Amino acid sequence: MEITVVKGDITEQDVDVIVNAANPGLLGGGGVDGAIHQAAGPDLLKECQEVINRIGTCPAGEAVITSAGDLQASYIIHAVGPIWKDGEHQEANKLASCYWKALDLAAGKELTSIAFPNISTGVYGFPKKLAAEVALYTVRKWAEEEYDTSIEEIRFVCFDEENLKLYNKLINSEVV
């Protein structure tokens, strides 16, 4: 399994599934969430509304999967990251859960490639370095435990230069 880091637009990634940094209502918003909803087209919003009607809101640390609308990917996994308060409200655990559950959903569909944004590091205010450490630790731990998986590539798609530098530094570190 290959873990890669790129700078770019998550909506343009040539992968089986992209992960959306969603809000609990799954109805789009700003940042990555808004960009994905806009690029995927109106059918995504309709499908997300159906999911919410069925399950209610999606709490932080949880994830659901939908089709990808007009995107190149086949699916979108909507992972609801935590809002950073002070680090004393299980924020790191909830963030790790987003990555773990997204990987479980992708593996459950026998997909081979998944692209993650930098979940919770925008308006949700999660410290970028800690978020990168949690993300890389979690996907590596998942890969160790789920070694017999269809997933061949886990890609982190960084929107900004700061996250790109953090991920590139940490990906080569044995600490994470």
UniProtKB/Swiss-Prot annotation:
InterPro entries noted in UniProt: Macro_dom (IPR002589), Macro_dom-like (IPR043472)
SUPFAM superfamilies: Macro domain-like
Disulfide bonds, paired cysteine numbers: none
Coiled-coil regions listed in the entry: none
Domain Macro: 1-175
Signal peptide limits: none
Transmembrane segments: none
Highest rank taxon of the organism: Bacteria
Family: Belongs to the MacroD-type family.
Protein name: Macro domain-containing protein LMOf2365_2748
